[in-house]
């Protein structure tokens, strides 16, 4: 079963886990409207995250525009412009192969790297199928926000299975 980041965050939120605020947009106009809703709560800095079933979205490239799959926007106008460069495009990451995956949805989220009054931390949590044993494996790490493959290679002790 594959779920998008926004769906996983909704599940965690339903269990009382405090998560980054965000909304799902399917058009650049919706992205701008939703970012305005977020900016009333915190700041104008917004993170736009392509929603595809693959990792490496931040370093991935949209074939048609050259944009990354995860970008920071500093204003509402920038949200709309950057959304145009992502939505409808084909995102190629190290996990998608050259064919990439079409981006139909965008997570419009608050920037958690702000210098605000609340402390913010990122973690990694994944449930994977170990194909060799046919068993689900839960992986967790304090090194959230980065490619977990890189953490596994450089600091395997930071991953709990």
Where are these regions (language model features)?
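Generic, ordered loop/turn and secondary-structure boundary motif
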Residues: 4, 12, 26, 53, ...
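A conserved helix-loop-beta module that forms one wall/lid of the active-site cleft
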Residues: 1-37, 44
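Structural signal for hydrophobic packing residues in well-ordered secondary-structure cores
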Residues: 16, 35-42, 80-94, 128-133
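Glycine-rich phosphate-binding loop of ATP-grasp-fold ATP-dependent ligases
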Residues: 20-22, 48-82, 124
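Gly-rich Lys/Arg/Thr-decorated short loops/hinges at beta-loop-alpha junctions or inter-strand turns
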Residues: 11-17, 61-64, 157-159
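ATP-grasp fold ATP-binding core
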Residues: 5-12, 41-61, 93-116, 125
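Hydrophobic alpha-helical hairpins/lids featuring a short glycine-rich hinge
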Residues: 80, 92-161
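Duplex nucleic acid-engaging cores and interfaces of nucleic-acid transaction enzymes
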Residues: 75, 87, 108
């Amino acid at each position: 079963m594959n779920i998008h980041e926004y769906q996983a965050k909704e599940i965690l939120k339903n269990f009382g886990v405090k998560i980054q605020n965000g909304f799902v947009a399917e058009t650049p106009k919706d992205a701008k409207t939703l970012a305005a809703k977020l900016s009333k709560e915190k700041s104008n800095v917004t993170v736009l995250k392509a929603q595809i079933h693959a990792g490496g979205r931040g370093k991935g490239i949209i074939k048609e525009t050259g944009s990354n799959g995860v970008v920071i926007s500093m204003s509402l106008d920038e949200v709309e412009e950057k959304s145009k460069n992502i939505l409808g495009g084909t995102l190629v990451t190290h996990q998608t192969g050259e064919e990439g995956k079409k981006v139909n949805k965008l997570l419009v989220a608050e920037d958690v790297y702000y210098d605000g009054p609340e402390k913010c931390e990122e973690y990694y949590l994944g449930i994977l199928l170990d194909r060799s044993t046919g068993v689900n494996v839960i992986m967790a790490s304090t090194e959230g926000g980065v490619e977990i493959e890189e953490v596994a290679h450089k600091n395997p002790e930071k991953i709990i299975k």
